[in-house]
UniProtKB/Swiss-Prot annotation:
Cofactor note: Binds 2 [4Fe-4S] clusters per subunit. One cluster is coordinated with 3 cysteines and an exchangeable S-adenosyl-L-methionine.
Biased composition (Basic and acidic residues): 21-33
Span of domain Radical SAM core: 89-307
Record region (Disordered): 1-33
Protein name (record): Lipoyl synthase
Enzyme class: transferase
Binding of [4Fe-4S] cluster 2, residues: C104, C108, C111
Taxonomic lineage from the root: Bacteria, Pseudomonadati, Pseudomonadota, Betaproteobacteria, Burkholderiales
One CC-aspect GO term: cytoplasm
The organism of origin for this protein: Cupriavidus pinatubonensis (strain JMP 134 / LMG 1197)
Keyword Transferase belongs to the record: yes
Composition bias, Low complexity: 7-19
EC number(s) given by UniProt: 2.8.1.8
Gene: lipA
C-alpha cells in the first residue's frame, strides 16, 4: 500500500465546516465558522428592564402580511435578520423588503442573514415587489438587500428597476433604500442610481472603525462614508441616512466621533440602537446601553446638525422609517 493511500485511509471524517457547500444558505454557526476573525465567547449579560419587544396584537395584520409576501415570492429583512420588532411592524402592515435573494456574499458575525453563493437575480422580482406594495397600499416603503459582490454593479440596476416599477404602480409612495457598500464598483453603482434615485438614501456604518475588522469583515469605514457623501454630492436634494449599533465593545466617545464623521460627510439622518445577538454563535453583547446614554446621543446628534435622530434600545435602521422621514420633513 502506498504512503498516499495510507494517509488517505487514516484521515478523520470531514467536519461540517470542511464539508462546505457554497450553494447552501448558511446561518448561525455554519456561517460564522468560516470567517477569519474568531468569535470570542463572553459571559451572557442579563437583559435589562428597558429591553422590551412589542408583540403583534390579536387583530393585527401579521399573518396577512406573511401570506402576501409568500404569495409574491418576496423576502423581508425583518424575517431573515430575525428583527425583534417584526411583530409590531408586520402587525401595522409595514415591512422592509429584501431584494436580490436571501444569501449574502458577506459573513458579518453580528447579522443573522444567511451566507452563500447567491442565486441568479429574479427578473420578475421588481414587478412582484411593485404589485405587492400597491396591494398593501403602502405610503412609505424601505427596500434593502443582501450584499451581491458577485454582480458587476453590486445590484444597483436591480435597485433602480425596483424603484422605477414601484413608482409606476404607486406614484405617491415614498421609497427609502438601505443599500450595501458597492465596494469595488462604487462609481458604476452611483451612476446607475442617479438615473432613478430613491427618496431617502440609507447605508449603515454599523459600528466604530476600531471594530470594523471584527464586525464587518470585507467592509471599509472610509469607503462607507464616501458612498454616502458622493451620493449626496450627485443628488443634493435626496436626504442621506445611516445607522449604528451599540453594545459591541465601543465607547460612548467612539460613537460620538462616528457621528461627527457622518456630519462631515453630509449625512442628514441618524439611527442608533442596541445590538442584540441573534444566537450564541454571533458576536456577544458586551454592554446594554442605558436610556440616559441614548438620550445623550440624541441630544448631541441635533447639536451636530442631524435633521432627525432616532435613538433608543429597540431602534433599527428601518424601524418606523416613515415617521423618521416625516419628522425630518422629507415625507
Amino acid at each position: 500500500m502506498s504512503d498516499a493511500l495510507i494517509a488517505s485511509s487514516s484521515e478523520a471524517p470531514q467536519s461540517p465546516a470542511e464539508q462546505y457547500d457554497p450553494t447552501r444558505k448558511q446561518k448561525s454557526a455554519d456561517k460564522t465558522a468560516r470567517i477569519p476573525i474568531k468569535i470570542v465567547p463572553a459571559e451572557k449579560l442579563k437583559k435589562p428592564d428597558w429591553i422590551r419587544v412589542k408583540a403583534a396584537t390579536g387583530n393585527s395584520r401579521f399573518y396577512e402580511i406573511k401570506d402576501i409576501l409568500r404569495a409574491n415570492n418576496l423576502v423581508t429583512v425583518c424575517e431573515e435578520a430575525s428583527c425583534p420588532n417584526i411583530g409590531e411592524c408586520f402587525g401595522k402592515g409595514t415591512a422592509t423588503f429584501m431584494i436580490m435573494g436571501d444569501k449574502c456574499t458577506r459573513r458579518c458575525p453580528f447579522c443573522d442573514v444567511g451566507h452563500g453563493r447567491p442565486d441568479p437575480l429574479d427578473v420578475n422580482e421588481p414587478g412582484n415587489l411593485a404589485r405587492t406594495i400597491a396591494q398593501l397600499k403602502l405610503n412609505y416603503v424601505v427596500i434593502t438587500s443582501v450584499d451581491r459582490d458577485d454582480l458587476r454593479d453590486g445590484g444597483a440596476q436591480h435597485y433602480v428597476d425596483c424603484i422605477s416599477q414601484t413608482r409606476e404602480l404607486s406614484p405617491a409612495t415614498r421609497i427609502e433604500v438601505l443599500v450595501p457598500d458597492f465596494r469595488g464598483r462604487l462609481d458604476k453603482a452611483l451612476d446607475i442610481l442617479q438615473a432613478c434615485p430613491p427618496d431617502v438614501m440609507n447605508h449603515n456604518m454599523e459600528t466604530v472603525p476600531r471594530l470594523y475588522k471584527q464586525a464587518r469583515p470585507g467592509a471599509d469605514y472610509a469607503h462607507s462614508l464616501k458612498l454616502l457623501q458622493e451620493f449626496k454630492r450627485r443628488n443634493p436634494n435626496v436626504p442621506t441616512k445611516s445607522g449604528l449599533m451599540v453594545g459591541l465593545g465601543e465607547t460612548d466617545e467612539e460613537i460620538l466621533e462616528v457621528m461627527r464623521d457622518m456630519r462631515a460627510h453630509d449625512i442628514d439622518m441618524l439611527t442608533i440602537g442596541q445590538y442584540l445577538a441573534p444566537s450564541n454563535h454571533h458576536l456577544p453583547v458586551l454592554r446594554y446601553v442605558h436610556p440616559d446614554t441614548f438620550k445623550m446621543f440624541e441630544e448631541e446628534a441635533y447639536k451636530m446638525g442631524f435633521t432627525h435622530a432616532a435613538v433608543g434600545a429597540m431602534v433599527r435602521s428601518s424601524y418606523h422609517a416613515d415617521q423618521q422621514a416625516h419628522q425630518a420633513g422629507f415625507a
